[in-house]
Amino acid sequence: MYPHLPCKIPGLSLIYDDESKVEKSKQLSTNASSSNFVKEDQIPSNLSIDNINTPQGDPIDKNNLNTNTENNLPNIVNFQNISSANSGEIKQKDNEILFSSTEDINQHKENYQDENKIDLLDVALANPKDCVVPSSGLLMPKEEFISNEEVGIPATNSSEKSNVKIADEIAEVTHSNSSIGKSSADLSSDSSSDSESNTSFSETDVEEEKAEEKSDAESMAPSTPPKTVNELPEQIYEKPEIVLQPNSLIEPLGKIIQVLKREVVVKSDIDDEKIVFDEKTVLCFEDRSIIGYIHETFGPVSSPYYIVRFSTEEECSAINACMGRPVFYVPTMANKIDPEPLKYIKGSDASNVYDEEINPSEQEFSDDEAEVAAKQLKKKRKRKAKSMVSGNQALPGEANFQSLNQNNVRNYPFYQTNQGSNPPAKRFTQEPPSSSLYSLSESSINYSTQSPMYYNYNYPQPSFPPFHPIYNDSIGYYSQANPQMYYANQVSAPPPQGSFDPNSKFYRNSSDSYRK
């Protein structure tokens, strides 16, 4: 880009100038002061490219320019003040274009600005103090402006946005006031109905308040553990009114392992399994202060646990029980039990409805023999069901299939097993003869002499030629009970030649034993 040519982008001609900003601003200010700026469709007079964009120390050398540069340069036009040229003709000067009407001037001015991209933004950047007000803009008087401080909203760059916000706030206030006035009017018009509804509301409010007070009282009440339907009421445990003397005999029992609100759990440290205590046994500490009675014994016989219960929490805290403190028993006030029968009692954890004990008959087996018998019966039922399935006898609701044995071989007979090859062919099945065939054979014309035990074949019984008398003895070997042995194409051999002639060598009497 040539430095003496104007910048084609509006407002950026100062950036591509070789002169400093200070000198450029001075030059533009002098040119701007000599020209007259107007607000509406007026441009400064004597405005040219030479005195704006061309530096003073760098004159234009037309010899260095291209041939098309002079043709591309814009026509320099010096516009006179339009106010002085209202309707008269403007004379033409040397190398200057003059116009006779304001319309031609305006049209040429627009074309001039479009071609050379020169507008008032360059002048405004050079002279920030001078303002150029467009003709379409109308300023609002200062009296009509409302400051942001008075309204109470943050300041913005645009006055129009602030005015819109103010108008919206005023509309909201008026809408709320109208709704309040409308609601007050509705209340005044429906005063009679409101009085009736207030009375009904007051009654329901009282009931709700009572219910809330009751629920609050229940929540503030001390929580109690849950109970079943038929659970017995809490028992009042008495504390033994006994005072032990300093020389009273006591024996070590164990240590406290847990302290609850109204219970103390003691674990026995006695190695002897024969020493097990039952209820009503008095326990005490090493200083012979009474703890209370044993109320429950649980756990294994070798190392049982004992529970001492109290009626209130104050009684439990009064004995100063703590975990790990040794506990003793008084031999003269101990209630021992024999643990040997307890070894043969098999307990049950089963429970009935409402967590109650079930009947002994419904509990778990207490007799080993009865338990063994029940298990054997259960196994027998399973074995029977399995055999029914393996024998191709389908159970109700089950599929008919053949089970596999341990060797992964189906339960075929021994002569049908063919391991390592293709599975055996399907066996030929034939229904056995029934007694109903007897009546069928008697009523049949073709088979009137047929035995009722014969199969009813689709083809007639085969016929045979007569036999020679010499073969009568051998006919007995062929039983008539199995007609499948005879076929129509299989006929006995004819007798030898001359067998009927007594003089022939082949003649044999029927009485002769030719088999000898």
Swiss-Prot record:
Keywords associated with the record: Nucleus, Phosphoprotein, Ribonucleoprotein, Ribosome biogenesis, RNA-binding, rRNA processing
One Pfam family per UniProt: Gar1
Segments for region (Disordered): 174-233, 413-439, 489-516
An individual GO BP term: ribosome biogenesis
The keyword Ribonucleoprotein belongs to this UniProt entry's keyword annotation: yes
Biased composition (Low complexity): 178-203
Signal peptide span: none
GO molecular function list: RNA binding; snoRNA binding
Presence of keyword Nucleus: yes
Broad class of where this protein is predominantly found: nucleus
InterPro entries, sorted: Gar1/Naf1_Cbf5-bd_sf, H/ACA_rnp_Gar1/Naf1, Naf1, Transl_B-barrel_sf
Family as reported in the entry's similarity comment: Belongs to the NAF1 family.
Task performed by this protein: RNA-binding protein required for the maturation of box H/ACA snoRNPs complex and ribosome biogenesis. During assembly of the H/ACA snoRNPs complex, it associates with the complex and disappears during maturation of the complex and is replaced by GAR1 to yield mature H/ACA snoRNPs complex.
Stated name of the protein: H/ACA ribonucleoprotein complex non-core subunit NAF1
Species of the source: Schizosaccharomyces pombe (strain 972 / ATCC 24843)
